[in-house]
Amino acid sequence: DVDIWKNQIVLSRTKISGEFTDNWTRLNLANALDLNGTKGDISKLINYRDSVFAFQDHAISQIYYNEKEQITTESGLAVQLANSNKLDGYKVLFDKIGCSNKWSVCVTTHAVYFIDDENKSIYMWGGGQEAPINITDKNGFNAWIRKALKENEQWTFDNFITYFNNSTSDVYFVNNDNCLTFNEIVNEFTSFYSYENTPYLQTMNKEFYMFRNEVNGVTMWQ
């Protein structure tokens, strides 16, 4: 129950092609991990560069899962030992930066982007030990994001949603009134587009599509 166990991660069984019972619905409560509740709820889990990270309101942590250890036998042969798909613990990487709006987290091939409502900033993070970069402060958009951010409702689309267009390397920060674009190639905010109030954008086969709520229903644009 996400309303009760807001700081707990539980592993399912491994999904197998052609299985009769969906293993993702079979949770093993003996294999669970509780994060520090003082850092807020877990809003988002991501898999980035072969590592799992958890976002809380006031922290970003790395989740240690199925960690491998290399040992050397008496014969000098190197052997890797794994812990059979178990959660090994976690490490808090940053405790003054976090994210409560899961829809604002966007993973690209270059970085992870997210909005910290508490600090009222947009961050770009490379997924390592180095702290995320506040790209709104760096690029002169601090006043704009503070005005554009609304009271966060993390389970709705009322606040910002972040999307990535892999054909142009553009990252879109979209809410009901704005669409601010950051380009990964030039590493700058480049423009405001008329994609505001767009609940879904997607790149397929190098073509960019968006779905919008109109008076007569949902429309698709290319």
Report residues per predicted region.
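A short beta-strand motif characteristic of beta-propeller blades
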Residues: 28-35, 89-95
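Homeobox/homeodomain signature
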Residues: 14-17, 25, 35, 50, ...
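Long, low-complexity, polar/charged, intrinsically disordered or flexibly structured peripheral segments
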Residues: 1-30
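Solvent-exposed, flexible loop/coil residues
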Residues: 28, 39, 193
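A general structural signal for stabilizing positions within well-ordered secondary structure
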Residues: 36, 43-44
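Beta-sheet-dominated scaffold domains
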Residues: 43, 49-51, 57-222
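Long, low-complexity, acidic Ser/Pro- and Gly-enriched intrinsically disordered regions
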Residues: 35-36, 68
